[in-house]
A protein has these predicted regions:
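Nucleotide 5′-phosphate-binding alpha/beta core
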Residues: 1-73, 77-80
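AMP-binding/adenylate-forming
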Residues: 56-69, 81-131
């Protein structure tokens, strides 16, 4: 199947499903991205590791992960300070959220996980408006 074969929503039903276990196997056989990209790892700004392990490429571009729409729908935007408690360690969750937060014009406090008392204190002192 080629991208030009997808001309309608109905064509999406014909796309094969790639299961997580298959992705792990492909990446183990052809590290790091399983031969599934049309370039090299050097074409990306970031590489993340998610449980599996699964390696995921990423880019530092405005809303690369397409998370701004959900944040905008939640009313987050310019003037907000968002305490981003997703992990920045290995997984893309922290950067995924951060790029969306920046795309809607809000300020990011990259807090990560843990240290509950410090998190609460920082939220109060910084004036966090979203979590």
């Amino acid at each position: 199947m080629h991208h030009q074969d997808i001309v309608s929503i109905d064509n999406l039903k014909t796309l094969p499903v790639l299961r997580k276990s298959e992705l792990v196997r492909l990446q183990a056989e052809n590290p790091p991205l399983g031969g599934l990209i049309a370039g090299t790892v050097h074409d990306f700004n970031q590489i993340f590791q998610s449980p599996g392990p699964i390696y995921e490429p990423g880019m530092v571009k405005k809303d690369w992960w397409r998370s701004a729409r959900a944040l905008n729908a939640a009313g987050i935007g310019k003037g907000d300070i968002v305490q981003n408690c997703f992990s920045y360690h290995f997984t893309p969750a922290g950067m995924l959220s951060e790029q969306g937060i920046l795309a809607v014009g809000a300020t990011v406090f990259p807090a990560g996980t843990g240290q509950t008392e410090l998190q609460a204190r920082a939220a109060s002192e910084i004036g966090v408006t979203a979590y």
